[in-house]
Amino acid sequence: MLDDLALFAVPPRELPLVAAVFVLAAAFIFGALWGSFLNVVIARVPRGQSVVTPRSRCPKCETMITARDNIPILSWLLLRAKCRHCGAGISARYPMVELIGGVAGTVAVARFGVTLPAAELFCFILILVAISFIDLDTFRVPTGLVVALSAVGLGFGLLRWQLLGPEASGGLAGDDVVDRLIGGVVAGIMLSCIVIVATGVLRRVKDKDGNPRVPPGEWAMGWGDPMILAALGFCLGWQAMPLTLFLASVIGSVIGIVLKATGQLKDRGPISDDDPWIPPDDAVPFGPFLALGGVLAAFFGDAIHARLLPLLGLGDGGVLLRYLE
């Protein structure tokens, strides 16, 4: 029996084709189901509602969604993106999040098999997805999910260290739990300092109307962003933090410039009926870019680092970062 169970700890690429397809398909379905739950989290957490009860309902006619209409991805396709009862449109975000969940499950199992590192990677991606969409919707970072992400990093690190010893490797941050602790603390302090300095500078910079770019009482960046970077530090270790912040800043700047140039940041109106705050015309949530930077660093950190250092004139790029091994 134990030998049969151990089979699933083997990466699918080392299994016979039929077994590999079965394991990966099961991982995709499992991930898509969690993606469906993630949609509930994204919709309810900002409102302070329970993610367990009541059951999901159509937001327009409030008819309870039955099991046959709640099959990840498939139900949305079969219903042609409309509620079965009232015909109201169903956002493409729902199947997109479910697809992301399925891909996350597949990638985690493909890389590690059914193991603790796979569970760690899966939880890491899904929590970042939830944080990102909530930040996009509300310009607010959900503290509870940031705490959960920190717990994933430290919890899995400690668990693997207890089970496999101090020489354990193969997780998101190599083999040292101390690296994760340092990463979380240093990353949070680092970005907090950047927020303070940027705020001081931008309060002295005037816009076209002669007003400070950052009015008194406001900050250049939300304080949820340092919390996200700290949580990423607890997951990836301190070595990954400079690259994570660099990637997030570059990608965020490029996308922000494109959105502003195309006029997509204007006339956005209030965040919601419950939150009358209207984002400035040049405001773009930074949380999703931090999340993307963290995922890119986790998967491609060594490769990016090895190519980036020579471009910056800092040597041959040797393997200085430790991510997925």
Where are the regions a protein language model picked out?
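A membrane-topology feature that recognizes alpha-helical transmembrane segments
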Residues: 1-325
